[in-house]
């Protein structure tokens, strides 16, 4: 069987920052972020332990690690949003997501991270809905990227990130006929 690893890595493609980020695009991204907990829960809750411990692609994370990664990543994103909203271009703290995915909590049942995702996305959604259009121009400095990023870009990035990992699970389920 011929496996397209690039497709398995990026089933919806890599994130592409639009040349112009409109307020409509921001609102669409907010809707994706707010709906992510329900979508990921629907995708993973019927899976068995064996299925949860199946990598979504050769050499990739298991579904369990992916769910825990989404909780970790989105908690960091939410914290970065709050920093950018309350400080002037704060420098954020990068982290090694692959190393985090190997820590002991990555072996926990997924319910812990699903609960975090649900609660945190509720809070994030409230903050996003409260933001004025000009708030999305606020920035934080990413030391690894060596430049500041606007919250408008970041909200689109995390909408993509949500759909990206949800697609990993959905494509695995389809490929394996689960």
Give the location of each predicted region.
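A broad, low-specificity signal for short, low-complexity segments enriched in glycine/proline
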Residues: 2, 26-30, 86, 127
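Short, contiguous, helix-prone interaction/anchoring segments in small proteins
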Residues: 21-57
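A short, mixed-charge helix-start or loop-turn motif at secondary-structure junctions
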Residues: 22-26, 103-110, 147-151
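Short, contiguous alpha-helical
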Residues: 1-12, 16, 52-98, 139-178
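Amphipathic, soluble alpha-helical interaction motifs
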Residues: 39, 43-46, 50, 80, ...
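A generic "alpha-helical surface" signal
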Residues: 27-34, 64, 68, 111, ...
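Acidic/histidine-rich alpha-helical segments that form the ligand environment
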Residues: 31-43, 100-138
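Generic serine detector
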Residues: 35, 45-48, 73, 112-113, ...
